[in-house]
C-alpha cells in the first residue's frame, strides 16, 4: 500500500517501513518522540538521506484502528487509511488539528488514495 502511494505521489527514491505496535509500545513511542503520554493511531518519521532519497518509518496501532471504526466500517479499511496517512506525512504533508483536519488538502488526498486501494469502493 505504501509503495503505491509513493508511486502515485511520484516519489521515485523513497522507501517506507511499516511497523504495527501494541498499545503499550505506541504509548511509549509517542512519549519518547513527542512528549505525549497517550495512545495514538499513527506516528510517522521522515528521514531524508544525503543522496536525496527518502526513508520513512510509519508506526500503526491496530488496537486504536479497531476503536476508530464506526458506522459499519471495517478494521482493514482503517488500517489502509492509517498507512496512507502515515505515508503522506513521510512525504511532507500535514493537516491542522481539530475540525479543519478533514477539510485539509492532505485529508482529501488520503481519502482519494484509500478509495483507490479499496478498488473504488466508497
Language-model segments: residues:
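Active-site rim/adjacent substrate-binding subdomains
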Residues: 1-78, 90-122
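Catalytic glutamate of the conserved HExxH
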Residues: 82, 86-90
Amino acid at each position: 500500500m505504501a509503495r503505491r502511494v509513493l508511486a502515485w505521489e511520484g516519489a521515485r527514491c523513497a522507501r517506507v517501513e511499516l511497523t504495527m505496535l501494541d498499545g503499550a509500545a505506541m504509548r511509549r513511542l509517542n512519549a519518547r518522540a513527542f512528549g505525549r503520554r497517550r495512545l495514538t493511531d499513527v506516528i510517522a518519521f521522515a528521514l531524508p538521506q544525503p543522496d536525496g532519497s527518502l526513508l520513512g518509518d510509519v508506526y500503526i496501532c491496530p488496537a486504536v484502528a479497531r476503536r476508530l471504526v464506526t458506522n459499519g466500517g471495517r478494521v482493514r479499511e482503517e488500517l489502509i487509511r492509517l498507512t496512507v496517512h502515515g505515508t503522506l506525512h513521510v512525504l511532507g504533508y500535514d493537516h491542522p488539528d481539530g475540525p479543519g483536519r478533514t477539510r485539509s488538502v492532505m485529508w482529501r488526498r488520503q481519502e482519494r488514495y484509500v478509495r483507490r486501494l479499496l478498488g473504488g469502493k466508497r
